């Protein structure tokens, strides 16, 4: 059995660790709730934006709208955006996203380009031999609309070249506080069938006039949509990451509680043994006439 001092030191270390894990649990809970609010607000914006885009698509025939973002049949490779966290201690959150990304990348044989958002995922991808051509950090800790706009401009710029014909985003979709799952979503090109389940707004019979042209108007909507979509991805990923970290820290705190209980019992036993040994030594000394 360890000495009383050794057990005390071990117990103190575990108690300090518990304070840290519990603080991280509380912080992750707060950040998760904040991210969930942003997800809800941004979802309303995206729904309105998609409804407007559907209004345009529903009132134009295929040959009336020759937009470069709609059902483009050009050849080329694909762009994959992989969204993970900047920090660890969040269970299997990052590894699940990277695993899905690797699976999707293996389906392409024409050298797709990878863009990483998140330090953890960037390192995991490089460890697996996938080197991102662009990397952004800070999206998980401080997701902003400005960063979403920067990423959107880069993605649209790549898509409009002759080298790429598809853009995919791999991230963790937030369903609820109990359910989050890694998902790969095609962002570009936009297909008419993508808007079948979107509820239209306004007068469905009214004639729309587009100035300066329908393509210019739709172009602007696409830029706003891609920016809004990436911001939504940031928020869903942030909520999912903080739930994963919250669960990991809660589990760590519970394990610390169990260890503290075990060490406290061990400390009491060590103290009793120490007292017993001291009494035995005193008794032996009395019998031998040492006292």
Which residues fall in each region the model found?
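C-terminal beta-strand-loop-alpha-helix "lid" module of Rossmann-like NAD(P)-dependent dehydrogenases
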Residues: 1-291
């Amino acid at each position: 059995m360890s000495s009383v001092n050794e057990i005390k030191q071990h117990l103190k270390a575990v108690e300090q660790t518990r304070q840290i894990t519990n603080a991280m649990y509380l912080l992750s809970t707060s950040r998760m709730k904040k991210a969930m609010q942003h997800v809800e607000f941004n979802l309303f914006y995206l729904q309105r934006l998609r409804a407007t885009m559907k209004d345009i698509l529903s009132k134009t025939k295929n040959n009336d709208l020759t937009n470069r973002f709609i059902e483009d049949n050009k050849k080329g490779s694909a762009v994959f955006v992989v969204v993970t966290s900047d920090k660890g201690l969040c269970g299997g959150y990052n590894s699940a996203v990277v695993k899905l990304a690797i699976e999707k990348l293996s389906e392409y044989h024409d050298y797709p380009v990878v863009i990483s958002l998140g330090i953890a995922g960037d390192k995991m991808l490089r460890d697996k031999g996938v080197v991102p051509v662009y990397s952004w950090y800070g999206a998980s800790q401080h997701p902003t609309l400005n960063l979403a706009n920067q990423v959107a401009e880069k993605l649209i710029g790549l898509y409009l070249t002759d080298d790429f014909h598809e853009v995919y985003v791999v991230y963790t979709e937030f369903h609820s506080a109990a359910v989050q799952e890694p998902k790969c979503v095609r962002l570009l090109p936009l297909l008419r069938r993508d808007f079948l389940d979107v509820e239209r707004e306004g007068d469905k019979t009214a004639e729309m006039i587009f100035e300066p042209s329908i393509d210019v108007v739709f172009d602007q909507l696409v830029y706003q949509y891609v920016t809004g979509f990436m911001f939504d991805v940031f928020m869903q990923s942030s909520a999912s990451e903080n739930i994963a970290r919250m669960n990991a820290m809660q589990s760590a705190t519970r394990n610390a509680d169990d260890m503290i209980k075990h060490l406290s019992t061990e400390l009491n036993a060590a103290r009793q043994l120490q007292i017993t040994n001291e009494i035995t030594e005193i008794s032996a000394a009395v019998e031998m006439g040492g006292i």
